[in-house]
Amino acid sequence: MAGHSQFKNIMHRKGRQDAQKSKLFSKLAREITVAAKLGTPDPAMNPRLRAAVIAARAENMPKDNIERAIKKASGNDAESYDELRYEGYGPGGVAVIMEVLTDNRNRAASDIRSYFTKSGGNLGETGSVSFMFDRLGVIEYDADKASVDDMLEAAIEAGADDVVSDEGGHEIYASQDTFRDVAKALESTFGEARKVALIWKPQNTIAVDDNTGEKLLKLIDLLNEHDDVQNVYANFEVSDALIAKLGG
């Protein structure tokens, strides 16, 4: 899988950058509320809500916060959020996709466009870069949940398209149409996953020099720090030395 380790490193770096728990919990709560509002407030009957709750648990979000976010969806004063996808090119021509939940799309667009302009990139139209990514479901388990062989066998039997296992855990990929069924089958064998989500996975990655890489990582940090930006994906690789230098 081209660029897989880099893809993981950059996503994990995002997790560490988001370690300001209040901001992270706010984003998780927003996704929980939106998921509950779009479907039933019962995670067992609402796959998107279940995935959001799993993500919140993985970050040790308190149970009270999770329940409050679910209840918020049914309140008369429940906020309304638009689900948007922004796409653009960062420094070095790297493709970037952002998933956004916002109560003010004009503000979100203005802020994101400003970030791209200041970084030397440009915000494009929807569809301008997403063709370079695959829309996939990913299911993640800790490494100690199963052996490599057992996870591979179970995932293939469940209908997964690909499995990547290393010391960091198991990542199982499936199409967006089947991944929830795959997740359900794996849960019956290995218990609850640490992550179940739809992602944009780059088909190929671009190796960039450290100067460009630093600009890109700063752009991604800016985007991730924005309250409305839920997820950021990009198709580049940087050196391990740069990741280490920047504390990643």
Swiss-Prot record:
Its main location: cytoplasm. One of its GO terms (biological process) is regulation of DNA-templated transcription. The keyword Transcription regulation applies. InterPro entries: Integrase-like_N, TACO1_YebC-like_2nd/3rd_dom, TACO1_YebC_N, Transcrip_reg_TACO1-like, Transcrip_reg_TACO1-like_dom3, YebC-like. One of its GO terms (molecular function) is DNA binding. Pfam families: TACO1_YebC_N (PF20772), Transcrip_reg (PF01709). It is found in: Cytoplasm. Residues 1-21 are annotated as: Disordered. Keywords: Cytoplasm, DNA-binding, Transcription, Transcription regulation. One of its GO terms (cellular component) is cytosol. The keyword Nucleotidyltransferase does not apply. Belongs to the TACO1 family. NCBIfam families: PRK00110.1, PRK12378.1, YebC/PmpR family DNA-binding transcriptional regulator. PANTHER family: TRANSCRIPTIONAL REGULATORY PROTEIN YEBC-RELATED, TRANSLATIONAL ACTIVATOR OF CYTOCHROME C OXIDASE 1. This is Probable transcriptional regulatory protein Nwi_2729. It comes from Nitrobacter winogradskyi (strain ATCC 25391 / DSM 10237 / CIP 104748 / NCIMB 11846 / Nb-255).
